[in-house]
């Protein structure tokens, strides 16, 4: 039991130290960019860009998304739009046609495909890769609402170093953040991920990750690495590792922003996050060999980072919870049965280990609150007193769901391997109008 406690405590302290390093990196990044002057001066040249929108039963939101893309502040003659209604049973295809027929979009380069192929989102992207005429491919999900300069900033970033920056990615913001308690918590999570974690990793290690939406990638480069993996649950993570393995960079275009809808029901949220967790597990396991090979150091760091987050640190938190509650239960039982021993303690007659676990929890809560408050402070209009109280409540509720989702996803991955199951269909997140 002492070994379990030592390993658990060491693991938690390591995770806290790592999180603090990334947090400090992000703070340094934002301190250097604390002014509000945004440079949108004309580019030396505007490469042709193919914007791809994969959509599966998205008739509620696809019209808004299509209009937002067609209204982007980028030369219209340098934009090709490919819309895919993939195996839809609703009016997604018809909604796309309605937008295309609007007078204000007459003459625009729009191709609409009523697709019946396989492979999910990755399959759509591979079909688009064969059709694309642009030097770069930009991807937006069907619920995305890019701001007018989103594409401009993505292109500007890759043009800073076209040889190394084969891709760029922006930030995503929650469209429906005030809908309910769940969406408010998701909003805080996304703000921390985008404003702290992604920024910190890029600033310190020049490591970027392809998100599911609002990213740009060199067309010929994608072809050279074999495109997207059909059926991948997280095609974005999978191709990110391919890019890093090639020695190229996925550059952060922090001024490129797009709004996206988040799940508004617990069931929808759970299924989405389980799919993401499963996909990330599969990618990590597939790339684990690079830890011990002569591959790119960024790949090694990312594999180690993912392994720690999804396996080591997650297990440590579960063990710490078990140790804490087992000890508390034993202490309560001692009030009635004095001979009961505390199961996890360096000295069976003291409660130091319980106090240490409480101290660990306090450290984790403080760091959690610090991350959220710094992230919110870096985004206009987000840092409020309500957000602080929400962060505290979400730590005790929403953030604990990550453990449940992770354990469920691990079990599902193991069963997939045993039963040789393959999940290649779309997993639909319910959309809402507005």
Task: Locate predicted features.
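Long helical/loop segments within the catalytic core of UDP-sugar-dependent glycosyltransferases
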Residues: 100, 104-107, 113-135, 148-233, ...
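N-terminal signal-anchor transmembrane helix
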Residues: 23-78
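Cell-envelope/extracellular polymer assembly enzymes that use nucleotide-activated donors
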Residues: 47-50, 80, 223, 238
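Acidic helix N-cap motif at the loop->helix transition within catalytic regions
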Residues: 63, 90-99, 149
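A conserved acidic beta->alpha catalytic loop
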Residues: 76, 85-94, 117-118
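Catalytic donor-sugar/metal-binding loop of nucleotide-sugar-dependent glycosyltransferases
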Residues: 231, 240-259
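Juxtamembrane C-terminal module of membrane proteins
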Residues: 22-46, 289-303, 330-434
């Amino acid at each position: 039991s002492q070994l379990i406690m030592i390993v658990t405590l060491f693991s938690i302290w390591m995770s806290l130290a790592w999180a603090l390093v990334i947090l400090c990196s992000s703070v340094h990044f934002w301190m250097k960019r604390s002014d509000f002057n945004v440079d949108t001066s004309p580019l030396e040249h505007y490469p042709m860009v193919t914007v791809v929108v994969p959509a599966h039963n998205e008739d509620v939101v696809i019209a808004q998304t299509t209009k937002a893309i067609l209204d982007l502040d980028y030369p219209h003659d340098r934009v090709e739009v490919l819309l895919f209604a993939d195996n839809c049973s609703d009016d997604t295809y018809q909604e796309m046609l309605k937008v295309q027929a609007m007078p204000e979009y007459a003459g625009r380069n729009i191709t609409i495909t009523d697709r019946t192929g396989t492979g999910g989102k990755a399959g759509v992207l591979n079909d688009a890769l064969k059709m694309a005429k642009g030097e770069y491919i930009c991807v937006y999900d069907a619920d995305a609402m890019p701001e007018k300069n989103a594409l401009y900033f993505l292109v500007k970033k890759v043009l800073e170093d076209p040889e190394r920056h084969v891709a760029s990615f922006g930030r995503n913001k929650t469209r429906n953040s005030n809908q309910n308690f769940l969406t408010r918590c998701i909003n805080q999570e996304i703000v921390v991920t985008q404003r702290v974690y992604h920024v910190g990793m890029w600033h310190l290690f020049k490591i970027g990750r392809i998100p599911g939406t609002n990213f740009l990638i060199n067309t010929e480069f994608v072809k050279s690495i074999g495109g997207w993996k059909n059926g991948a649950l997280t095609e974005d993570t999978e191709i990110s590792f391919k890019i890093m393995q090639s020695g190229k960079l996925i550059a952060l275009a922090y001024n490129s922003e797009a709004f996206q809808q988040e799940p508004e029901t617990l069931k929808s949220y759970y299924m989405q996050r389980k799919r993401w967790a499963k996909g990330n597990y599969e990618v990590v396991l597939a790339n684990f060999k690079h830890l011990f090979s002569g591959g790119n150091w960024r790949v090694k760091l990312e594999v180690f980072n993912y392994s720690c987050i999804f396996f080591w640190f997650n297990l440590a938190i579960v063990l710490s919870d078990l140790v804490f509650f087992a000890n508390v239960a034993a202490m309560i039982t001692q009030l009635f049965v004095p001979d009961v021993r505390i199961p996890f303690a360096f000295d069976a007659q003291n409660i130091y280990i319980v106090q240490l676990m409480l101290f660990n929890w306090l450290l984790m809560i403080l760091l959690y609150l610090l991350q959220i408050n710094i992230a919110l402070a870096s985004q206009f209009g987000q840092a409020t007193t309500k957000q602080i109280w929400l962060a505290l409540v979400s730590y005790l509720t929403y953030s604990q769901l990550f453990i449940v989702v992770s354990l469920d996803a691990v079990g599902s991955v193991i069963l997939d391997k045993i039963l040789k199951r393959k999940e290649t269909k779309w997993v639909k997140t319910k959309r809402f109008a507005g």
